[in-house]
Design a protein with these regions (language model features):
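Peripheral, non-catalytic segments flanking oxidoreductase cores
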Residues: 1-365
Length: 365
């Protein structure tokens, strides 16, 4: 089934006009665990289109260039990866390509990764303390990536502020302003640009619903999401021109399909009642879903949301897209506490300790 997520305006967030009931409807025990923010700054639409176009350019680079931006030591939590995660059935996930970047630049433009602590160093926790690996010779990629992430994190700060107002009233001993502080000051926030490769026309359709991205919980606080962009990569091959007669600031944006050629492709959430719900995010909006750290910080008042993603099935596109290679691109920004921040007061667990266990569980051996 398809369901509309709770929607609020950016202006209401800025003015503190989001009611507690709205937050409970969005994030509470009986919710989908997702909120959509509308009326975001105008530049968001342009930045989204440009960065999600870059996702196809990146995914179609020659393998030798992609190899240069892989970082196995970080368990692929910086740079490019493909085929480094496992699906529910134990198979290696080659359906999607992933580019991770640290968003420490939001706090300090000179930072390329999280700040080390006494407990966590680049040697013992490279997953969060390895510097970014930006692809070379992709004009405007880094600039666009950082600009879009800043805008999304700015909005996440406002969502966090609204959550704090609720938590201060409803949770005993809650530290006022804690979640906003976490989102605004964190150097561990990460962004993930995703490229779901066009399905092989000869591939057999999987019977499992979550065959493209196994059902999981995000382990941060609030995950900012763009709507997905669908691209016909047969009609417009996303190859970077070898030479330009001038030095462009950005690569050309790619044409976005009006809608997904496969109505089953997209983001799915498992509701609290056990139903599987498809959630659609408008192109000019930013969605935020809850992660495990937020559930712990709010002592279960706000629940982490189990979710998965399906790409476009082979052979379902019709009309002018019949037989075409259809890619799905999107961006997720995981706002997370600093490594030393306590996310579970009862058990005295820091985010670094919590994240280390999650990363170990999710990475292929």
């Amino acid at each position: 089934m398809t369901s509309a997520a709770v929607t609020v305006s950016l202006e209401d967030l800025k003015n503190g006009n989001v009611s507690f009931q709205t937050l409970v409807d969005a994030f509470g025990p009986d919710s989908l665990g997702i909120i959509v923010v509308k009326d975001v700054p105008e530049e968001f639409v342009q930045l989204r289109h440009r960065l999600l176009s870059y996702s196809s350019y990146l995914g179609n680079l020659p393998q030798f260039r992609l190899d240069k931006i892989e970082n196995p030591a970080s368990k692929y939590l910086t740079g490019w990866s493909r085929g480094k995660e496992t699906l529910k059935n134990g198979q290696i996930d080659t359906h999607k390509g992933s580019f991770y970047a640290n968003c420490a630049f939001y706090v300090d433009p000179s930072l390329d990764c999280a700040k080390p602590t006494e407990e966590f160093s680049p040697a013992n926790f490279p997953e969060y303390l390895s510097p970014n690996l930006w692809p070379s010779n992709i004009a405007g990629f880094k600039e666009t990536f950082e600009d879009l992430c800043r805008l999304i994190i700015d909005t996440a700060v406002l969502v966090a502020r609204a959550c704090d107002q609720y938590a201060s009233k409803e949770i005993p001993d809650y530290k006022p302003g804690y979640l906003e502080h976490v989102v605004k000051t964190s150097t561990t926030t990460k962004a993930r640009l995703l490229h779901y490769f066009p399905a092989d026309a000869d591939a057999k359709e999987e019977s499992n619903d979550d065959d493209w991205c196994a059902t999981h919980l995000d382990h941060g606080c609030l995950t900012g999401l763009t709507s997905a962009m669908f691209i016909n990569e047969t009609k417009q091959v996303p190859a970077i021109p070898i030479t330009y007669s001038y030095n462009p600031r950005y690569l050309p944006t790619l044409a976005e399909l009006d809608s997904s050629p496969d109505p089953t492709a997209g983001l799915y959430i498992q509701s609290r009642s056990g139903e599987t719900v498809q959630v659609k995010i408008p192109r000019d909006c930013i969605a935020f879903q809850t992660g495990e750290a937020l559930e712990r910080i709010t002592k279960g008042k706000f629940k982490a949301v189990p979710h998965y993603v399906r790409g476009v099935r082979p052979g379902v596109a019709g009309g002018e897209n019949d037989g075409a290679k259809i890619a799905r691109n999107t961006l997720a920004v995981f706002t997370q506490p600093n490594l030393g921040e306590i996310v579970d007061l009862d058990q005295d667990i820091s985010f670094g300790e919590f994240a280390r266990g999650i990363v170990e569980k999710n990475t292929t051996k």
